[in-house]
Amino acid sequence: AFICKNSWGQDFGDEGFFYISYYDTNIGMNSVVYTKLGNSDNYDKIYQSDLMGEVGTMGFDDRPEAYFANVYTAGKNETLKAVSFYATGPKTTYDVYVVTDFTDVSDLQQRTKVASGEMQYEGYYTINLNEAVPLADDRKFAVVVHVNTQDSTMPIAIEYNNDEKTANFDITDGEGYISLYGTKWSSAEQENDCNVCLKAFTDVGD
């Protein structure tokens, strides 16, 4: 048997250790592999509303592409350095945009492209911006992402309450939007009962 150590603590098994049979038929299902990890102090602040991470995915009309956005309120003297989100399938192309002065959903049309590229494999990625973006003090800003995922018709990773394990998590703590073409937007929280998995990273004082 394999001897495993639970990374979530010592409550399960024998103080966190447990056995898995070589003949177990489920051990290879839903596997996650970390190939590269950044330092936890890469950036000064993180903006996020998806504390559970990806619980599921969604899309539009069996299309491989979609837009999604999250809105946050900047602190003092911050610059936006990077964003992170999921590729729900291999060979996902992406464009990242920023709206530095967000007042309502119509401002998402005034987005400025700050990064683009392709993610070869399905997974979770941190994308550094081409240049740091200064943010206005105490003002809302929006991060917008367009993805095209060739092998998936559910290109948006979302957080939502899907079973008893996630029933008590708050999905009303964000302001997210989704769109097929980036023109007509719907609220992730109010109309789709979910949060968008899209984080923003800033440095203070740069």
How should each PLM-predicted stretch be described?
Residues 57-59, 83, 120:
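Intrinsically disordered, low-complexity segments enriched in polar/charged residues with Gly/Pro
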Residues 74-82, 91, 138:
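Extended extracellular/luminal ectodomain segments enriched in beta-structured repeat modules
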Residues 5, 69-71, 81-86, 97, ...:
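Residues within well-ordered beta-strands of beta-sheet-rich folds
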Residues 1-77, 97, 155-205:
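Active-site signature of cysteine proteases
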Residues 90-171:
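Aromatic- and Gly/Pro-enriched, solvent-exposed loop/edge beta-strand patches characteristic
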